[in-house]
């Protein structure tokens, strides 16, 4: 009985059996460090105290304004890296080969390379849809147009159609939070929204629609103007009106020293 109990506690989990190379060296973080050393890389897995408890299944590697996170597959043996730059996730990859994982991490994090170049060199890397726009420094215009073309965001389209033509507002980076259209001084996350107004369709101002989808469609068919609520810092009410009026309210409440959105995050 005692022998069976000891064998039970010594038995390996399915993950450990699937990744013997990780089991051998004590987890994913150690294995990645070993691979990076093989390539004479300057990189090391981030020594974050919060990650100490998950050394086997997760790792984060940073260099300047770039970083990658690595996960592992639970049902199939796969190393799953992502590729971040200046607060934006630009690509994902999957490989069964930990040596390839070390190579792609070193190449991405230690070189001034585009996402396109990364994918051309490593066929297992798939750029995100927005990656090309960020590579070509066109992310602000791209994101404005993406919101305008997003059918799930029709409730803010009346406002976006005029805001996208405004030379001040269209130089900020737009993003949505629930039903609210927000603006940022930077193009990466976390965003810099301090003291910048945002706009919410009035029917969604309390985070719950007061109209059904059917009645919302009927509103468009009857050409009823959508009303927008403009706020700042989440709780300061600035005004309410149609799209044109909301734009005027926003511009009256923009900081005097406002500049076009920069690459990077609120932290840098």
Question: In which residue ranges do the predicted regions lie?
Answer:
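Short glycine-aromatic motifs
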Residues: 41-43, 207, 216, 260
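Polar low-complexity intrinsically disordered regions
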Residues: 1-14, 163, 202-227, 265-268
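Negatively charged, low-complexity tracts enriched in Asp/Glu with abundant Ser/Thr
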Residues: 2-58, 114-190
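Short, structured surface segments that line ligand/substrate-binding pockets
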Residues: 56-66
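Ampiphathic alpha-helical segments that act as solvent-exposed interaction surfaces
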Residues: 90-121, 223-268
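Intrinsically disordered, low-complexity regulatory segments enriched in Ser/Thr/Pro
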Residues: 64-104, 177-241
């Amino acid at each position: 009985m005692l022998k069976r109990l000891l064998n039970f506690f010594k038995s390996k989990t399915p993950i450990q059996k699937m990744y013997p190379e990780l089991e051998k060296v004590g987890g994913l973080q150690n294995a990645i460090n070993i691979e990076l050393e093989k390539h004479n890389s300057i990189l090391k897995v981030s020594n974050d105290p919060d990650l100490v408890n998950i050394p086997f299944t997760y790792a984060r590697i940073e260099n300047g304004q770039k970083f990658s996170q690595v996960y592992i597959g639970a049902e199939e043996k796969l190393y799953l890296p992502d590729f971040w730059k200046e607060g934006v996730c630009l690509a994902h990859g999957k490989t069964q080969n930990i040596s390839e994982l070390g190579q792609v991490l070193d190449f991405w994090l230690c070189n001034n390379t585009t996402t396109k170049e990364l994918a051309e060199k490593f066929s297992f890397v798939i750029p995100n849809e927005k990656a090309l726009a960020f590579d070509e420094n066109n992310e602000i215009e791209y994101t404005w147009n993406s919101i305008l073309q997003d059918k799930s965001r029709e409730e803010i389209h009346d406002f976006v159609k005029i805001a996208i033509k405004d030379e001040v507002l269209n130089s900020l980076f737009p993003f949505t939070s629930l039903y609210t259209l927000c603006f940022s001084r930077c193009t990466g996350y976390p965003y810099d929204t301090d003291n910048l107004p945002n706009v919410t369709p009035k029917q969604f101002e309390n985070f719950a629609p007061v109209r059904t989808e059917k009645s919302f469609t009927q509103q468009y068919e009857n050409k009823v103007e959508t009303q927008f609520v403009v706020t700042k810092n989440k709780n300061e009410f600035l005004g309410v009106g149609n799209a044109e009026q909301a734009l005027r309210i926003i511009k009256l409440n923009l900081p005097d020293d406002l500049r076009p959105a920069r690459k990077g995050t609120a932290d840098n």
